[in-house]
From Swiss-Prot:
This is Protein pxr-1. Involved in rRNA-processing at A0, A1 and A2 sites and negatively regulates telomerase. Keywords: Nucleus, Ribosome biogenesis, rRNA processing. Residues 228-237, 304-318 have a biased composition (Basic and acidic residues). GO terms for biological process: rRNA processing. Residues 25-79 form the G-patch domain. It comes from Neurospora crassa (strain ATCC 24698 / 74-OR23-1A / CBS 708.71 / DSM 1257 / FGSC 987). The gene is pxr-1. It comes from the Eukaryota. Belongs to the PINX1 family. PANTHER family: G PATCH DOMAIN CONTAINING PROTEIN, PROTEIN PXR1. GO terms for cellular component: nucleolus. It is found in: Nucleus, Nucleolus.
Amino acid sequence: MGLAAAKNKRKLGTDPNNTKWSRNETTFGQKILRAQGWQPGEFLGAKDAAHAVHHTEASSSHIKVTLKDDNLGLGAKRNNGDECTGLFDFQHLLGRLNGKSEDVLEAEKQKRENHIRNHYLEQKIGTIRFVRGGWLVGDVVKEKVTEEDGVPQSDTVDQQVETVPSQDTKDAEPTKRKSKKRKADSDEEDEKEEKKDKKVKKRKTDTEAETDSESSRSKKKEKKDKKEKKDQKEKKDKKDKRKLKDAKQSEESSSDDLESSATETKKSKKDKKKEKKEKKDKKKDKKEKKRKEKELSDSATESEDSKSKAQKRTKDGAEIETSTPGGSGTSTPTVTSSTRFLARQRFIAQKKMAFTDSAALNQIFMIKS
């Protein structure tokens, strides 16, 4: 950005390299290490350890720690925006517009892909280089038998080499030696053919024995499988029978429990009904007793009131009779209080008669004698 960039002012302090903390000997860790016998410049751990030889100055220096604030893997580099995505495709498009042939474009594309692949492998694997493996110590070269002829490959190679000698040897050797060699070669060929026949026979016998053993093994396996299946079926049948028995027993026990619970509930309901009836009867009896007591008290009070009123009336009548003049000889008709309350007196008299009669009282209160 040049002059238009943001100006960051930095003030250099007394410790610009930030090394004061490394020289501070009053920290908690320094105190603990010194108490354990450590001194500045020494390595941690046993001095006579087997790996103490490999210690260097880096083993006694400070450890650099960086704060990891992302989810990338260890050693992964984040994209800082300096990589242009799609640049190769853009170059491919420009090449087609410029009239490049398809072969050239394909070669460039392959070159770019190889470059990207190599770059990825360099980051992933690093400086590892893979080398073609050779013979290890102690390996033994074994002859591979061909399936068609049953002859080892090494024998065939030797045979071809022997049967095809060089032209220089042919010219140098005399004709007698040629005939001897031919005889020897023919004898060797006969021996090899015999060996081949023997090997073929052995293979046949081996294959027959293997087939017989395999058939016997297969029969044994079939028998074992049949036995295992029978055992499994028997076990399953036994388990099913046990399950049925358990289910029946559980059903019977559950039915018994239900019946017992039903009878208990019925009994409890009956008991509750009886208790309710008894409570109601008791309440009714109490109410009837209270009613009778009230009626008796009311009747007693009424009788007392009627008696007191009758006495008052008789007194009033006597006073009136005494107050009338007796010398005239004629009596004036006076309206007494008895005529006024005649109907009420009759009712009161009937009531008194009823209270005196016990049979009438029983009829009134509906009491069975």
